[in-house]
Curated annotation (Swiss-Prot):
Molecular function terms, GO-annotated: acetylcholine receptor inhibitor activity; ion channel inhibitor activity; toxin activity
Major location category of this protein: secreted
CDD domains named in the record: TFP_snake_toxin (cd00206)
InterPro entries hit by this protein: Snake_3FTx (IPR003571), Snake_toxin-like_sf (IPR045860), Snake_toxin_con_site (IPR018354), Toxin_cobra-type (IPR054131)
Family the entry assigns: Belongs to the three-finger toxin family. Long-chain subfamily. Type II alpha-neurotoxin sub-subfamily.
Species per Swiss-Prot/TrEMBL record: Ophiophagus hannah
Functional description taken from the UniProt entry: Binds to muscular and neuronal nicotinic acetylcholine receptor (nAChR) and inhibits acetylcholine from binding to the receptor, thereby impairing neuromuscular and neuronal transmission. Pseudo-irreversibly inhibits twitches in chick biventer cervicis nerve-muscle preparations in a concentration-dependent manner.
Protein name: Alpha-elapitoxin-Oh3a
GO CC annotation terms, alphabetical: extracellular space
Source lineage: Eukaryota, Metazoa, Chordata, Craniata, Vertebrata
Keyword list, A-Z: Acetylcholine receptor inhibiting toxin, Disulfide bond, Ion channel impairing toxin, Neurotoxin, Postsynaptic neurotoxin, Secreted, Signal, Toxin
Subcellular location, record wording: Secreted
Pfam families: Toxin_cobra-type
Length: 93
């Protein structure tokens, strides 16, 4: 009886996947990290600075509880699956 109860507890924990958190790419190292509890959104934030024409857009990657507010001149993409915010590739002419 104890074995059956223990088996049910283990199966419940495995099925519920308690404590699961999202993994996102995070700058500056652009490596995959587990997001803090409650931050289940990955985001990619891009914008132009003075070097945009020669170096490309600036990029900020990270985790958030909600999708960040869009500011003028800033593009934000949000997603909610593991590592869904890779560093964007630059389109070459």
């Amino acid at each position: 009886m104890k074995t059956l109860l223990l088996t049910l507890v283990v199966v419940t924990i495995v099925c519920l996947d308690l404590g699961y958190t999202t993994k996102c790419y995070v700058t500056p190292d652009v490596k995959s990290e587990t997001c803090p509890a409650g931050q289940d959104i990955c985001y990619t934030e891009t914008w132009c600075d003075a070097w945009c024409t020669s170096r490309g857009k600036r990029v900020n990657l990270g985790c958030a509880a909600t999708c960040p507010i869009v500011k003028p001149g800033v593009e934000i993409k949000c997603c909610s699956t593991d590592n869904c915010n890779p560093f964007p590739t630059r389109k070459r002419p």
